[in-house]
Regions:
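Amphipathic protein-protein interaction modules
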Residues: 48-107
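Short, structured coil/loop segments at alpha-helix boundaries
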Residues: 33-37, 95, 99, 115
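Negatively charged, low-complexity tracts enriched in Asp/Glu with abundant Ser/Thr
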Residues: 1-51
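Short linear, low-complexity motifs centered on an aromatic residue
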Residues: 112-119
Length: 119
């Protein structure tokens, strides 16, 4: 899987963390989210990469549903694919309400952006 670097796919990325370079990214497109939400997202992404390794991306799919992607480099033999799937399921369970609200927020954001582009 390639990281979305530009275009529509990149605009759908909410946040991500990279264990290889120890960096966290938050998409400025979503800067109007409350600080508490931004902090929760950072915690989710950073803890995931600390426990599992690799690169973690939280993004909206084409239907506006929140999805997670986990990517590893070819030579990363410490990456835990089984743990990655278990952690992914745990995150969806633990943050179900937050993710539902984020999907609503994203739908509203798309609607506003669409209306702005018409005028």
């Amino acid at each position: 899987m390639n990281l979305p670097e530009q275009g529509e796919a990149a605009k759908r990325v909410l946040c991500g963390a990279n264990s290889y370079i120890e960096k966290y990214f938050f998409n400025p497109r979503f800067q109007n989210l409350p600080e508490e939400v931004q902090e929760s997202l950072q915690k989710i992404a950073v803890v995931y990469t600390e426990e599992i390794g690799g690169i973690f991306i939280l993004q909206f799919d084409e239907d506006g549903k929140l999805d997670m992607a986990s990517i590893k480099e070819d030579d990363d033999f410490l990456y835990d694919p089984i743990g990655a799937e278990l952690k992914r399921k745990q995150i969806f369970k633990d943050y179900k309400e937050l993710f539902s609200k984020l999907e609503e927020y994203y739908a509203g954001l798309l609607k506003i952006e669409k209306e702005k582009s018409k005028s």
